[in-house]
């Protein structure tokens, strides 16, 4: 059963898996929760090739921004006022770019198109926070790469709010 955990915090785990497909495209995966179980989960092939894993992660977050905004608008319209929206990612370089925008680009990331910095505007407007999530705890890995054994069952349990 899906339910909110009472903290009024919308949490979204986003991950990009670099060059997963034969055509060298990357994979975006994400899951959103109000505490107990996922309210939105997605896994999509990215529409463009990327040069770095940082760019893959930035595009993954950009791909899921409409889901974040729409869900927050729907929740507010239904009377559920969230205190915070937190986006979790496991790539510190992508987090830096998302928070600071183009000005924190280096020679490895200055080619990234400005359209992928929509998330920076949302961060600066205080519509969401961006936090680091260690790779071993990244629930979105469930949607971007093949998992085996313990991790598969751990993430499935979190996403579906299953009991032991």
Residue positions per predicted region:
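Structured nucleic-acid-interacting core domains from mobile-element enzymes and related host factors
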Residues: 1-14, 80
């Amino acid at each position: 059963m899906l339910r909110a955990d009472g903290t009024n915090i919308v949490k979204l785990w986003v991950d990009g898996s670099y060059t997963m497909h034969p055509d060298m495209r990357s994979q975006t995966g994400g899951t959103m929760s109000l505490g107990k179980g996922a309210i939105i989960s997605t896994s999509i092939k990215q529409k463009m090739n990327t040069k770095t894993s940082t760019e893959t992660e930035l595009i993954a977050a950009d791909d899921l921004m409409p889901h974040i905004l729409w869900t927050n608008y729907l929740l507010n319209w239904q009377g559920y006022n969230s205190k915070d929206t937190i986006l979790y990612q496991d790539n510190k370089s992508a987090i830096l770019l998302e928070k600071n925008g183009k000005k924190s680009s280096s020679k490895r990331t200055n080619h990234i198109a400005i359209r992928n910095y929509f998330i920076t505007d949302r961060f600066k407007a205080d519509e969401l926070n961006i936090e680091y999530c260690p790779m071993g705890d990244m629930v979105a890995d469930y949607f971007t790469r093949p998992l085996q054994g313990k991790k598969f069952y751990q993430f499935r349990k979190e996403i579906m709010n299953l009991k032991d």
